[in-house]
């Protein structure tokens, strides 16, 4: 049993301030146990940056969630890395490679904490196809069928 994270971002969703939307959730034993949808505090210059900022925020929450569930005895060990799924290849590359990329030099240093988590083996950032990114409904409206599919993947049951 392990906690798995899903992260997504919608770029430039607010026409007034040009900020993006972050969404992430964590699933344990087939049920969403923690989630968040919020406007980012910075103006991202690209979709990749918005996704990277979201992944960084999710990684901090994910490590707390992992430690919390271990302390409760739900998960036996914190030694295995937590998997966080992201649908943006550029954001995944930024998280995995602790070197400066030409198009990401402007990203604020505080978001590079995810690189440290990956380097230490606390987190593994993996690619998920956008159609299977369970965090999608936390960042944008979806067609009903897709929304219901994601709710089912979250373990949410309609009564």
Residue ranges and their predicted role:
Residues 2, 20, 38-159:
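RNase H-like nuclease module associated with reverse transcription
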Residues 5-48:
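RNase H-like nuclease fold core
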